[in-house]
Amino acid sequence: MIEHNPTTIYGTTIVTVRKDGKVVIAGDGQVSLGNTVMKGNARKVRRIGKGNVIAGFAGATADAFTLLERLEAKLEQYPDQLMRASVELAKDWRTDRYLRKLEAMMLVADSKATLALTGTGDVLEPEQGVMAIGSGGNYALAAARALIETDKSAEEIARKAMNIAADICIYTNHNIIVESLDAQ
């Protein structure tokens, strides 16, 4: 049996789907401290920049907000260039002593690109327009990949994937927040 540190904040699930001219990021609202649900309606998916980028985060909340702020600063420096801003953030993440200790991951998307920014400073693009992170990420990813070839919309796929993850992962709930953008 796996022992969990009761003072560590665990889990969330974030999924992104890009399909048929839409890009969606969805996330649940649960915040757990050890084996206790501390909050069920946290907002882990939001619009950043000028509202033309959506982001979802998993991991330590304070760390995630630090990274969101840094990404917003990079987007101001490189307007309408999500890939460039993300790569520049990743460079900082890998070289800055303070940032290297941050324990968070993010999925970000604009009309042109969907990216995962990992805790090791990697910038990854999804296969098949689908990617997921967090404690229920593998469940959401499997569900979304199974549904991507159906006639369901990007939002329907993301919601179904999140509900499946919430049914399986104890650190994920059914309070799902969705943000979407028109995609190229």
From Swiss-Prot:
SUPFAM superfamilies xrefs: N-terminal nucleophile aminohydrolases (Ntn hydrolases)
Primary location group: cytoplasm
Subunit description: A double ring-shaped homohexamer of HslV is capped on each side by a ring-shaped HslU homohexamer. The assembly of the HslU/HslV complex is dependent on binding of ATP.
One GO term describing the cellular component: proteasome core complex
Family listed: Belongs to the peptidase T1B family. HslV subfamily.
Cellular localisation: Cytoplasm
Top-level taxon of the source organism: Bacteria
Protein name: ATP-dependent protease subunit HslV
Entry annotated with the keyword Transit peptide: no
Activation/inhibition comment: Allosterically activated by HslU binding.
GO molecular function: metal ion binding; threonine-type endopeptidase activity
Function: Protease subunit of a proteasome-like degradation complex believed to be a general protein degrading machinery.
Enzyme class: hydrolase
Entry EC number(s): 3.4.25.2
Binding site for Na(+): A166, C169, T172
Keywords: Allosteric enzyme, Cytoplasm, Hydrolase, Metal-binding, Protease, Sodium, Stress response, Threonine protease
